[in-house]
Amino acid sequence: MADKIKDAKIVFVVGGPGSGKGTQCEKIVEKYGYTHLSSGDLLRAEVASGSERGKQLQAIMQKGELVPLDTVLDMIKDAMIAKADVSKGYLIDGYPREVKQGEEFEKKIGAPALLLYIDAKAETMVQRLMKRGQTSGRSDDNEETIKKRLDLYYKATEPVIAYYETRGIVRKINSELPVDEVFAIVVKAIDELK
């Protein structure tokens, strides 16, 4: 089964909570027929299912802690295999959060062709998340939790970006720009993969 995904185009999408990476991923799916896999969405779906694993995950997430690496990786791999026949490529959103995760991903699944680093200022991300929290009802969208998530994000992500920069596959995208301008830059990066 895993052979099916061996030659697929894999794009890591990294960006803080509220950076706009979800929006950009939607646009990529629409234009390129990629499968968008968000580790956060996969985790939330597992929690919503009420399974035993879901209950354990919920307890971890409510504390604002990171979910164990193997759990996330298994969920991503299962989801990739499930979509292998219909997918033109994969957007792996919100992963890897640390270098070790990236290394494990490559061992078990494959190497990324590109890392899109969707970057916005910290205050922009806080504002966007506060606004989203008013409408989403997501329990992790309150200011204290948001700041904690951003701190965790920066600490974890900087080494990841540096690690992939040494391979020359990182494209830093300024997501302070209007959505369509951001997407134009994203398109350029993906088109270079062909």
Curated annotation (Swiss-Prot):
This is Adenylate kinase isoenzyme 1. It comes from Cyprinus carpio (Common carp). It catalyses: a ribonucleoside 5'-phosphate + ATP = a ribonucleoside 5'-diphosphate + ADP; AMP + ATP = 2 ADP; dAMP + ATP = dADP + ADP; dATP + AMP = dADP + ADP. Monomer. PROSITE patterns: ADENYLATE_KINASE. The keyword tRNA-binding does not apply. CDD domains: ADK. Residues 38-67 are annotated as: NMP. Catalyzes the reversible transfer of the terminal phosphate group between ATP and AMP. Also displays broad nucleoside diphosphate kinase activity. Plays an important role in cellular energy homeostasis and in adenine nucleotide metabolism. Also catalyzes at a very low rate the synthesis of thiamine triphosphate (ThTP) from thiamine diphosphate (ThDP) and ADP. One of its GO terms (molecular function) is adenylate kinase activity. It is an enzyme of class 2 (transferase). Keywords: Acetylation, ATP-binding, Cytoplasm, Kinase, Nucleotide-binding, Transferase. The modification N-acetylalanine is found at residue 2. Its main location: cytoplasm. Its cofactor is Mg(2+). Its EC number is 2.7.4.3, 2.7.4.4, 2.7.4.6. GO terms for cellular component: cytoplasm. Consists of three domains, a large central CORE domain and two small peripheral domains, NMPbind and LID, which undergo movements during catalysis. The LID domain closes over the site of phosphoryl transfer upon ATP binding. Assembling and dissambling the active center during each catalytic cycle provides an effective means to prevent ATP hydrolysis. AMP binds at residues 39, 44, 65-67, 94-97, 101, 138, 149. Residues 131-141 are annotated as: LID. ATP binds at residues 18-23, 132, 177. It is found in: Cytoplasm. One of its GO terms (biological process) is nucleoside triphosphate biosynthetic process. Belongs to the adenylate kinase family. AK1 subfamily.
